[in-house]
UniProtKB/Swiss-Prot annotation:
Keyword terms: Activator, Calcium, Cytoplasm, DNA-binding, Phosphoprotein, Repressor, Sporulation, Transcription, Transcription regulation, Two-component regulatory system
Organism of origin: Clostridium butyricum
InterPro entries found in the cross-reference section: CheY-like_superfamily, Sig_transdc_resp-reg_C-effctor, Sig_transdc_resp-reg_receiver, Spo0A_C, Spore_0_A, WH-like_DNA-bd_sf
GO process terms (BP): detection of stimulus; phosphorelay signal transduction system; regulation of sporulation resulting in formation of a cellular spore; sporulation resulting in formation of a cellular spore
Gene Ontology cellular-component annotations: cytoplasm
Record domain Response regulatory: where: 1-59
GO MF annotation list: calcium ion binding; DNA binding; DNA-binding transcription factor activity
Subcellular location: Cytoplasm
Protein name: Stage 0 sporulation protein A homolog
Essential cofactor(s): Ca(2+)
Function recorded in the entry: May play the central regulatory role in sporulation. It may be an element of the effector pathway responsible for the activation of sporulation genes in response to nutritional stress. Spo0A may act in concert with spo0H (a sigma factor) to control the expression of some genes that are critical to the sporulation process.
Cofactor binding annotation: Binds 1 Ca(2+) ion per subunit.
Top-rank taxon, per record: Bacteria
Length: 161
């Protein structure tokens, strides 16, 4: 945040694109980083493929902070335990499935820092894509999530509960 504050005091001709990789996922800090001019904010651990995709999107189509400062922020969530906040205007891209799922989980009140959060989000995404998984939660859903996150099905179940 200190670097962002310093950048804001400098009289730069062209504002650099700023991507923040952090271990801190607190809403206040994330929002402050975006307010200070960060283009993207992601919390570790994150999916490198999704992160690379977001960076490419940012440099191919995203406006600068100054161009979009009057418009509201869009939150985009990859399928890992991280999330990326961007200052892109909402009208540029439609709300995707990941964002919708994360918003609903947040509304319910599940805190993002708990281990079960990422498992729950992954489970919902998988069920949306294949409703048959609902009839085999302990036999197929939990084991497939466990495999993806290199853990056991019982740990996935316990963390979600």
């Amino acid at each position: 945040l200190g670097v962002l504050e310093k950048l804001n005091t400098m009289d730069l001709e062209k504002t650099p694109r700023i991507i923040i990789l952090s271990a801190v996922g607190q809403d206040k800090i994330t929002q402050q980083a975006i307010t200070l001019g960060a283009d993207y904010y992601t919390v570790k651990p994150f999916d490198m493929e999704v992160f690379t995709k977001r960076i490419r999107e940012m440099f191919n189509s995203a406006p600068t902070i100054q161009e979009s400062s009057a418009q509201s922020n869009r939150v985009s969530y990859p399928t890992t335990s991280s999330y990326i906040l961007t200052s892109e205007p909402k009208s540029k891209t439609p709300v995707d499935l990941e964002t919708e799922i994360t918003n609903i989980i947040h509304e319910i009140g599940v805190p993002a820092h708990i281990k079960g959060y990422m498992y729950l989000r992954e489970a919902i995404t998988m069920v949306v894509n294949d409703m048959e998984l609902l009839s085999a939660v302990t036999k197929e859903l939990y084991p497939s999530i466990a495999k993806k996150y290199n853990t056991t099905a019982s740990r996935v179940e316990r963390a979600i509960r």
